[in-house]
């Protein structure tokens, strides 16, 4: 009975190990594994590779060429007033997004305000006509001053943290000073889109924000709306989605929301992918835009040919900073080295237009995966006995198969299965179970060796340990083969030997016979004078029959 109490029931061991996967579930739910999970999502993007989108996105770069040709920031808005009409009217693009907040904050008073105001008026005049141009608004500046000099504190208003009693401050919006004398005489365009992302990253962005002034949609949402030809009042916000609805009531597309507000961006390609991301310098576009009005017919013809390129036709154009000196860079799932963040808007537009949204399982399903995979892998990994190596290999193959399935589901269905929590829970629980199993096996081996080490061979002891069964102290019925041996005429010649030589002879004889019996899988029962009693088939059955064996009797004579 003592042996049975020494080994705790199997269910008790697993019950004590159950908190391990639960802790991993809590860590996953609290977002403490997000960094590692995001890294594994990046690997899945790279495993999947580049995919195509049903919308053309062209990037007009504010790059080193543009900065060296036009000059350093801030530019006169005249340059934008010339480029935008050329892209929309001449090139036939569907919409343009300008990834720069047209703000008068931080502009030096020493600049030529006459020229700046002239440029502001020219761009304001064009934008007031309502072209499909989305200008940028942002919460990037947390502290600002309004026209009265009052400090304004801004932070991105998230719906999950919103308090109904505290209306959020609006973002910093475009403002054009249109008076040389009065700095407070400002004009702002009506079509404005947010350019913010969560934590300045490239994975998630707010589809909209409610403020005390109005609701602002993300620039990518506005560009997608223009692409589909939906009116501003056709954008309907619900708890878990946004609908684009035409005037006749038909649904154009539905944008699923994460946390009632967020869009998770599906990246379609690396930044340096000419086929997916055609790019051209702002300086080049500006030069050709100016050539459209040249007196030289050859220049006008060259400009018309430039804007007639098929890449422009019905494309979405994004104008944004790409020069590293402008410090608008971030890493992406495809690019470990930071690249221009204007690519966020391009991939977000592609996500909305294509409908290829990243999908995640419900929380309950994620937790079920963690617990289920942990139980399966741990049971296999902790299995002992003769099949222990095979079951451990099966556990490793099961984990490998899960990782492969996670990559395939992402590749084929854009579904994100959790990896960090399931793998972490399976590894840690399996490790703890294996260590526990080893400790129990060592204790079991010690008990069996203590009981049978003098009677059975080491190989048989190992077999008893591997069998996982405790010795049955109460006895049991089984078929065994008994073995008896003694020395012929022992009484006669023992009288002729002295006690010393007799003891030496008996030790040598009994040791040799015992070794031979144990080598054949037998178990020593006892010594009776010069006789030895042994048995075959207990405490464990023989793996082979005794038929045809060479009996130890021939070796003990």
Question: Regions from the language model: what does each represent?
Answer:
Residues 419-478, 504:
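Regulatory cytosolic signal-relay segments
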């Amino acid at each position: 009975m003592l042996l049975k109490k020494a080994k705790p029931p199997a269910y008790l061991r697993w019950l004590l190990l159950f908190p391990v996967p639960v802790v991993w579930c809590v860590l996953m739910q609290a977002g403490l594994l997000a960094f590692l999970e995001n890294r594994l999502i990046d690997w899945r993007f790279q495993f999947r590779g580049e995919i195509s989108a049903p919308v053309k996105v062209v990037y007009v770069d504010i790059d080193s060429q543009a900065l060296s040709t036009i000059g350093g920031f801030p530019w006169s808005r005249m340059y934008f007033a010339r480029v935008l009409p050329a892209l929309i009217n001449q090139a036939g693009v569907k919409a343009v997004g300008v990834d720069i907040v047209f703000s008068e904050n931080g502009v030096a008073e020493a600049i030529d305000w006459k020229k700046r105001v002239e440029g502001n008026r020219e761009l304001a005049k064009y934008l007031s006509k309502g072209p499909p141009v989305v200008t940028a608004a942002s919460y990037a500046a947390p502290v600002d001053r309004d026209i009265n000099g009052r400090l304004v504190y801004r932070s991105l208003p998230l719906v999950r943290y919103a308090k109904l009693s505290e209306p959020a401050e609006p973002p910093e919006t475009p403002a054009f000073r249109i008076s040389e004398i009065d700095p407070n005489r400002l004009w702002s365009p009506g079509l404005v889109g947010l350019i913010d992302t969560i934590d300045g990253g490239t994975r998630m962005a707010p589809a909209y924000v409610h403020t005390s002034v109005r609701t602002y949609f993300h620039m990518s949402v506005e560009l997608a709306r223009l692409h589909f030809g939906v009116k501003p009042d056709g954008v309907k916000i619900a708890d878990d989605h946004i609908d684009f609805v035409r005037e006749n009531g038909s649904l154009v597309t539905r944008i699923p929301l994460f946390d009632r507000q967020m869009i998770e961006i599906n990246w379609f390609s690396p930044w340096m992918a000419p086929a997916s991301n055609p790019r051209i310098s702002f300086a080049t576009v500006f030069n050709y835009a100016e050539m459209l009005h040249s007196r030289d017919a050859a220049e006008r013809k060259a400009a018309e040919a430039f804007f007639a390129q098929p890449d422009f036709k019905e494309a979405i154009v994004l104008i944004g900073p790409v020069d590293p000196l402008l410090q608008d860079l971030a890493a992406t799932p495809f690019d470990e080295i930071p690249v221009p963040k204007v690519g966020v808007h391009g991939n977000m537009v592609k996500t909305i237009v294509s409908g290829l949204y990243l999908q995640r399982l419900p929380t309950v399903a994620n937790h079920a995966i963690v617990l289920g995979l942990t139980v399966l892998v741990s049971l296999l990994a902790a299995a002992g006995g003769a099949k222990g190596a095979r079951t451990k290999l099966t556990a490793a193959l099961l984990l490998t198969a899960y990782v492969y399935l996670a990559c395939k589901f992402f590749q084929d269905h854009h579904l994100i299965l959790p990896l960090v929590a399931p793998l972490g829970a399976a590894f840690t629980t399996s490790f703890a179970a294996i260590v526990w199993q080893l400790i129990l096996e060592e204790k079991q081996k010690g008990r069996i060796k203590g009981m049978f080490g003098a009677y059975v061979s080491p190989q048989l002891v190992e077999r008893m340990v591997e069998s996982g069964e405790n010795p049955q102290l109460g006895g049991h019925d089984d078929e065994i083969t008994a073995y008896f041996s003694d020395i012929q005429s022992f009484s006669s010649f023992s009288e002729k030997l002295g006690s010393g030589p007799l003891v030496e002879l008996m030790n040598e004889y009994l040791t040799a016979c015992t070794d031979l019996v144990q080598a054949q899988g037998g178990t020593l029962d006892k010594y009776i004078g010069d006789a030895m009693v042994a048995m075959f088939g207990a405490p464990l059955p023989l793996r082979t029959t005794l038929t045809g064996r060479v009996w130890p009797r021939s070796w003990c004579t």
